From Swiss-Prot:
SMART domains: B12-binding_2. This is Dimethylamine corrinoid protein 1. GO terms for cellular component: cytosol. InterPro entries: Cbl-bd_cap, Cobalamin-bd, Cobalamin-bd_sf, Corrinoid_p, Dimeth_corrin_MtbC, Met_Synthase/Corrinoid, Meth_synthase_dom. Acts as a methyl group carrier between MtbB and MtbA. Methylcob(III)alamin binds at H105. The gene is mtbC1. It comes from Methanosarcina mazei (strain ATCC BAA-159 / DSM 3647 / Goe1 / Go1 / JCM 11833 / OCM 88). Belongs to the methylamine corrinoid protein family. Pathway: One-carbon metabolism; methanogenesis from dimethylamine. Residues 92-216 form the B12-binding domain. Pfam families: B12-binding, B12-binding_2. GO terms for molecular function: cobalamin binding; cobalt ion binding; methionine synthase activity.
Amino acid sequence: MTSKEELLQELSEAIISCKKDAVLAAVEKAKQVMEPAEIIENGLAAGMNQVGVLFERGKLFLPHVMMAADAMTAGVKVLEADMPAGTETKKLGVIVNGTVEGDVHDIGKSIVSTMLQSAGFEVHDIGRDVPIKNFVEKAKEVNANMIGISALMTTTLQGQREVIELLKEEGMREKVKVMVGGAPATQAWADKIGADCYAENASEAVAKAKELLVGK
């Protein structure tokens, strides 16, 4: 008889291998002895967290991350189909994520969106080169708890401050947390502009989002 720990390890390793078939096979085995929520949180999401760490260390690359996320989505869909009617995977929070106006780089931001989604957040990725007002309008539209603002150049960093200022003007700052990131951003910069947190990479973005939105 395979233990729960071994099944969770198998789920995690299947995600890291980026093989959808292996993930689905592991899910089928695990659901005989575990609840869907446990399989998702302690098996699939744990594997996806490890994928994020390996990506940051240069051990895995962007295609691997996307394949792993796709495999996890497939596994979650199987589990959701088995849940009683009226239940669904609990969302940890709603996040709007984008790269500020004037900045056309978005690989790092896309990785953050993928990792946040895999961790259980509802993510609205609004792309790159996004006008300041669009961040706030989207947050209003989807009733977001957090906005993630990426800037990859020193010339576009100011856009992060402008989003925060606009949130204040709209009376939304108390309700919406702000996370900043990108190569020129630092914790000191986040403190200076009044952001709630700074994330150096995708793994840290997930940890900080959980801390701010779930850890209360």
